[in-house]
Amino acid sequence: MEIENKNIKEIESIITDEIDNSNNIINNNNNGNINEHIINIQNEKKFELVELNPKFLKSPTMIVLALVLGVFSLVGLIFIIYFSIKK
């Protein structure tokens, strides 16, 4: 009987250890997901701040970039119209 009781206690301790290990793994995974979610939210807020910053949009480089892109798009549109009429 003593041998059986020892075996049962060993099996119980092994089972409880495995349960504790699995709970730790689950908790670590949940913490990792929460941390990734927090980092994603922080990154989204950084991009929002850049997009909504009026000083950045009114800077000379942004104005020049907008003008250059506008000129390129107009020239491209004129070429498309010219070659479509030419055929």
Curated annotation (Swiss-Prot):
* Main location (coarse class): membrane
Compartment(s) = Membrane
Keywords, in A-Z order: Membrane, Transmembrane, Transmembrane helix
The UniProt transmembrane annotation reads 63-83
- Taxonomically, which superkingdom? Eukaryota
A Gene Ontology term for the protein's cellular component: membrane
Its topology with respect to the membrane?
A: Single-pass membrane protein
**What's the name of the protein?**
Putative uncharacterized protein DDB_G0287489
Organism this protein belongs to: Dictyostelium discoideum
